[in-house]
């Protein structure tokens, strides 16, 4: 009986197996997943997770030599694509921005800790569009001139502080960056790095950075965990407490400006612009206060980071410092400080700003984008939900674009044969680098940052020489040119000492005179 049944059933099973295999084969052959970009093979379950440890920008650069400008990684089931050329990054993130302007989901850092109000993390949608439009109108190239007086005053204080306490040059850079951004956002300059507002916002940045790190919370891998009641989930309770605390902080700063606007005694600031245009942008006070706070948190860290790298470059490449000082002597002279009125006449200083942003990036892999729909690029399939990372480190140091000396600090690469600023590479939007990002997510504060860097660099080089420090025997102190440390949202050079002296006899007196005219004694 068993043998008869087996003989009757076997052909059916064979036919079924043939159909299933044929169907599966056809599905596989037709599946776009067969055409993923090339990339390293991963391990079972975790995929390429181990490749993403350490300095990712160096790993991506090395792997790019084998796999090309478009690389695919499987990160524990999450598709990730790395963009290793300016053209590929611009093709996708700029020219197909409609598909690639989202951010990866981050339940703790974005949804809970910041209530979806942190514009750099906010998912692509209506809230982001309204916040982005408001920020753009307050910080676009046509209006940032109103911040010139603040930036000039802060550059004077920076220069005076460094000349008075050269051993604390980095502290003065960080104070100035915080003060300038705080003044431009809230018209409330802090008194020092220890100012409660600065300390509280720096604490916010540190907590946010920890929460946003990959693998920081299991809920990012198991989204159902977000529905666990707060009393049973310490991570959720702490994130909610952070949101309450930080909302109160940002709203307090914002309401201070609101009170001054009501009295009619406010000065130009981003917060006052947001308040005056609140109805037009349809943003709540909470959304506006978080938008202003985000601009401070992002701007202060990045500007001070760039200035630290620039200081290192002045020591390692002294010939660029001398050329910049020669330009300052020719245009400004030695009887007054540089100002924004000199901007058009100082092309080498402006080129130095571009080079400082290109040579060492404060964020070597930028902020990730996410695709919102399936796409095909150059024959390769990029599925919806893919995280895309532009390897800014390599994009800014590509020898095919910047020449064989791309790894070196050389502002002259941004000048033409007549010594004027040359047009930037095709996909850099006239910045001559891609440090500010791409597409609809490009840094909205880049014009403010460029201006701050210009006046800080011009004034410091006008007044001082920056050289390599030595020990008591005149032996140069160690200097790690290639190393870096990760500090919150940015990377900074390994701490180093610098020898800073007045460039000519009257320099310090002129700076002090300007400082007193600002009301500081």
Curated annotation (Swiss-Prot):
Q: In which pathway does it act?
A: Secondary metabolite biosynthesis
The record's subcellular location field reads:
Membrane
Any stretches that span the bilayer, and where are they?
A: 9-26
The residues that the entry says bind heme are: 443
| Enzyme class, first EC level, given as a word | oxidoreductase
Task: Name the coenzymes or cofactors required.
Answer: heme
User: EC number(s) on record?
Assistant: 1.-.-.-
One annotated GO molecular function: oxidoreductase activity, acting on paired donors, with incorporation or reduction of molecular oxygen
Which CDD domains is this protein grouped with? Answer: CYP64-like
Keyword Metal-binding found: yes
Q: How does it sit in the membrane?
A: Single-pass membrane protein
Taken from the UniProt entry, a GO cellular component term is: membrane
Q: Which residues are glycosylated?
A: 450
Give the record's family classification.
Belongs to the cytochrome P450 family.
Function (record text): Cytochrome P450 monooxygenase, part of the gene cluster that mediates the biosynthesis of melleolides, a range of antifungal and phytotoxic polyketide derivatives composed of an orsellinic acid (OA) moiety esterified to various sesquiterpene alcohols. The first step in melleolides biosynthesis is performed by the delta(6)-protoilludene synthase PRO1 which catalyzes the cyclization of farnesyl diphosphate to protoilludene. The orsellinic acid synthase armB produces OA by condensing acetyl-CoA with 3 malonyl-CoA units in a three-round chain elongation reaction folowed by a C2-C7 ring closure.
Q: Which PANTHER family match?
A: CYTOCHROME P450 MONOOXYGENASE ALNH-RELATED (PTHR46300:SF2), P450, PUTATIVE (EUROFUNG)-RELATED-RELATED (PTHR46300)
**What is the protein's given name?**
Cytochrome P450 monooxygenase ARMGADRAFT_1018420
């Amino acid at each position: 009986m068993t043998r008869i049944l087996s003989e009757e059933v076997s052909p059916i099973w064979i036919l079924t197996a043939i159909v299933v295999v044929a169907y599966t084969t056809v599905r596989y052959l037709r599946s776009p997943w067969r055409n993923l970009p090339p990339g390293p093979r991963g391990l079972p379950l975790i995929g390429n997770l181990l490749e993403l440890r350490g300095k990712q920008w160096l790993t991506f650069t090395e792997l790019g030599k084998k796999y090309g400008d478009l690389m695919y990684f499987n990160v524990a089931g999450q598709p990730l694509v790395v963009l290793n050329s300016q053209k590929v990054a611009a093709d996708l993130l700029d020219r197909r921005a409609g598909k690639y302007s989202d951010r990866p989901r981050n339940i703790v850092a974005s949804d809970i800790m910041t209530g979806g109000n942190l514009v750099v993390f906010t998912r692509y949608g209506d809230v982001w569009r309204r916040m982005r439009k408001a920020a753009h109108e307050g910080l676009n190239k046509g209006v940032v001139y109103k911040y010139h007086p603040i930036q000039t005053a802060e550059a004077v204080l920076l220069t005076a502080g460094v000349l008075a306490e050269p051993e604390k040059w980095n502290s003065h850079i960080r104070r100035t960056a915080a003060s300038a951004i705080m003044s431009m956002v809230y018209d409330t300059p802090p008194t020092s790095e220890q100012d409660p507002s600065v300390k509280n916002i720096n604490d916010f940045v540190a907590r946010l950075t920890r929460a946003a790190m990959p693998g920081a919370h299991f809920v990012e891998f198991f989204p159902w965990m977000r529905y666990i009641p707060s009393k049973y989930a310490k991570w959720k309770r702490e994130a909610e407490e952070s949101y309450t605390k930080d909302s109160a902080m940002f709203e307090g700063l914002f309401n201070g400006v609101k009170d001054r606007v009501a009295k009619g005694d406010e000065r130009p600031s981003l917060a006052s612009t947001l308040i005056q245009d609140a109805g037009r942008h349809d943003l709540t006070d909470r959304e506006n206060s978080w938008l202003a706070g985000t601009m401070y948190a992002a701007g202060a860290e990045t500007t001070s980071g760039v200035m630290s790298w620039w200081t290192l470059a002045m020591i390692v490449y002294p010939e660029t410092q001398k050329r910049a000082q020669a330009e300052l002597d020719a245009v400004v002279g030695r009887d007054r400080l540089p100002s924004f009125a000199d901007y058009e006449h100082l092309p080498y200083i402006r080129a130095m700003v571009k080079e400082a942003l290109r040579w060492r990036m404060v964020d070597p892999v930028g902020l990730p984008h996410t695709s919102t729909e399936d796409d095909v690029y150059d024959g390769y399939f990029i599925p919806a939900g893919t995280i895309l990372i532009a390897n800014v480190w390599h994009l800014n140091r590509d020898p095919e674009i910047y020449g064989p000396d791309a790894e070196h600090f050389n502002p002259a690469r941004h000048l033409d044969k007549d010594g004027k600023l040359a047009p930037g590479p095709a996909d850099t939007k006239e910045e001559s680098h891609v440090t500010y990002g791409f597409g609809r997510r490009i840094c909205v504060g880049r014009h403010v940052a460029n201006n701050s860097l210009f006046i800080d660099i011009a004034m410091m080089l006008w007044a001082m020489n920056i050289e390599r420090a030595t020990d008591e025997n005149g032996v140069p102190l160690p200097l790690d040119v290639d190393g870096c440390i990760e500090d919150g949202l940015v990377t900074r050079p390994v701490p180093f000492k610098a020898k800073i002296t007045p460039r000519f006899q009257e320099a310090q007196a002129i700076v002090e005179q300007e400082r007193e005219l600002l009301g500081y004694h």
